Design a protein with these regions (language model features):
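Conserved alpha-helical substructure of the radical SAM core
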Residues: 87-258, 262, 266, 357-358
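Radical SAM/AdoMet-radical enzyme domain recognition
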Residues: 197-358
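Short Fe-S-cluster ligation motifs
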Residues: 203-219, 472-473, 508-537
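Short, acidic, Ser/Thr-enriched surface-loop or helix-capping motifs
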Residues: 433-434
Length: 537
């Protein structure tokens, strides 16, 4: 029986088809993780494991959760965050906290919210709070968005949002490479229906009005489009955080400086191998590796230390054996982050399912990335939602925990935040905008178009699309994703479920807890190879 990508789910194997394989459930995984790592001294001496040093507890709680669940406080929050002429009160509250020049009228008006900030900001000094929150445009936008969301929908795990926290904007279809796995199926020329500069600037204005704190520019290759600089400058005017995902081949020192002046502080450059020939063959152009590595050096040499680069690698069967070398290269090139991209068979990668990792390979990879994150040698990002589960299970209480699209942070409070914003954010806390203005839940779900920015507001598109309720409800899942102990922190990759089963609510067959479903795919489709679980144990 053939099971092409996007077709219906394969029938279950008959019990006598193959020897029974030992599968792992999330409950067993959690129990095993609790006693996973004793330090070397305790292990050597045989000293008992102290429960205060536990590594996993999926029921973290913070007093702020009680406040946010109170209907009276939600009403107060709604009043603070409501949009009005001059902007929401909450924006003014955040921007004026700790300001010695604040008028007595404003001191009285904002006494209660300022008191709450003092109560919940912990050991952060007033000056530090002003620098990192009140005077940081993206944080203010994000907090207003979150406050409006809690006021409207209540506190929910995962949290529903009135507007996306992140927009990934595939700025143009044009690209100068021909990557074998391109999710966008990018071309060497622009498409005739791409947004005009006027439409692009208007879209930024609308995103700011909806309190969208971050826009990530991708493509195609966004740096080929001359409209990118004026659009970046408009984002900077509104306080929107911007990043550029690029192949790096155009990023000369002069271009890096121009984008940095326009407000970009993070560049994410794709590099698939430490072997130049291997990378160039995959990317379809000789010399690509050399130019990308030089671009990473150009960014590292920029005089502003806040301008940084991440090395992004899509890990497949073709470069799984290079993971350690890629990490070392990222560190040697002074990157601030190593970014793992989950392989998803869409776009030009649609016929490459045999290159996908097995669940056990992916689990090994994520555990290795967690170890790297805890070492703090370099930041770690992953588009695999299972990374949040891995951090929760194998990081110490004060260790780094991934909150999916929002990065990672340390400590118990980070685990509370991850409960609400962690895991797959497709169509829930982030959305994709295509070069022509079409909107989809995720860059890896290009066929799930739910509207166009030329016709409707961002809020209407985001909350009114046919996938929103489904993607916000993790009880509506198939396979182990429905009952998983970690579903608040993961939820499975909806794009992978959609690519393999044609169903955004399907199980993610790349997860260790759905390994039986992966085995069924392998057995049902000869195209999906079953490679050895190299280094995956």
């Amino acid at each position: 029986m053939s099971t092409a990508v996007g077709s219906s789910k394969p029938a279950l194997k008959a019990s006598g088809d193959a020897p029974e394989r030992r599968y792992v459930s999330s409950a067993e995984y959690a129990a095993r993780a609790r006693d996973f790592r004793l330090d070397a001294k305790r292990r050597a001496t045989g000293a008992p494991h102290r429960r205060s040093q536990r590594y996993i507890d999926v029921d973290y709680h913070h007093p702020l959760e009680d406040w946010l669940s109170n209907h009276l406080f939600r009403a107060f929050l709604g009043w603070l965050a409501a949009d009005r002429p001059g902007g929401p009160h909450l924006r003014r509250v955040l921007q004026t906290y700790g300001d010695p020049k604040l008028s007595w009228a404003d001191r009285l008006r904002y006494a209660l919210p300022h008191y709450l900030i003092r109560r919940f900001k912990g050991s952060v000094t007033d000056e530090r709070f002003r620098q990192r929150v009140g005077q940081h445009g993206p944080t203010v936008l994000g907090l207003v968005n979150t406050a409006q969301s809690v006021a409207r929908f209540g506190l929910s795990a995962p949290q529903r949002f009135v507007a996306p926290l992140i927009i990934v904007w595939n700025f143009t279809q044009q690209c100068n490479l021909s990557c074998a796995h391109c999710y966008q199926s990018a071309s060497h020329g622009k498409q005739p229906d791409e947004l005009t500069l006027r439409e692009r600037l208007n879209l930024v204005d609308r995103a700011a009005a909806a309190f969208v704190p971050m826009i990530a520019f991708a493509g195609g290759e966004p740096t080929l489009d001359p409209d990118l600089l004026p659009v970046l400058r408009r984002c900077r005017e509104h306080g929107i955080h911007t990043t550029i995902a690029s192949n790096g081949t155009t990023l000369t020192p002069e271009r890096v400086a121009a984008y940095a002046e326009a407000g970009v502080q993070y560049f994410e450059l794709s590099l698939d191998s430490v072997d130049p020939e291997r990378h160039d063959r995959f990317r379809g152009q000789a010399g690509a590796w050399r130019r990308t590595v030089q671009a990473l050096r150009n960014i590292a040499d920029h005089p502003d230390p806040n301008v940084r680069a991440g090395l992004a690698a899509c890990i497949t069967q073709d470069n799984f054996d290079e993971v350690e070398d890629l990490i070392r290269l990222a560190i040697d090139l002074k990157c601030c982050a190593f970014c793992h991209f989950n392989f998803i068979p869409v776009g030009r990668g649609r016929g490459m399912t045999r290159h996908d990792l097995t669940p056990r390979q992916r689990d090994w990879l994520l555990r290795r990335l967690n170890d790297l994150a805890q070492s703090r040698q370099i930041g770690v990002l992953s588009t695999s939602p299972q990374f949040g589960r891995t951090c929760l299970a194998y990081a110490p209480i004060d260790g780094m925990v991934a909150a999916s699209h929002l990065g990672a942070a340390g400590g118990e409070k980070a685990r509370v935040v991850a409960k609400y914003v962690g895991g797959c954010g497709a169509g829930r806390c982030y959305m994709c905008i295509e070069p022509n203005g079409d909107c989809t839940p995720c860059v890896y779900m290009p066929h799930r178009v739910f509207g166009n920015v030329r016709q409707r507001s961002l809020g209407e598109l985001f909350r009114g699309n046919p996938y929103w309720d489904l993607l916000c409800d993790r009880d509506r899942r198939d396979g182990h994703c429905q009952v998983c102990s970690f579903k608040n922190y993961c939820g499975g990759c909806r794009a992978r479920a959609d690519a393999y089963y044609g169903d955004p609510a399907g199980a993610d067959p790349g997860c260790l807890f759905n390994e039986d479903m992966w085995d069924q795919l392998v057995a049902a489709d000869a195209q999906v190879a079953s490679p050895a679980d190299v280094a995956a144990g």
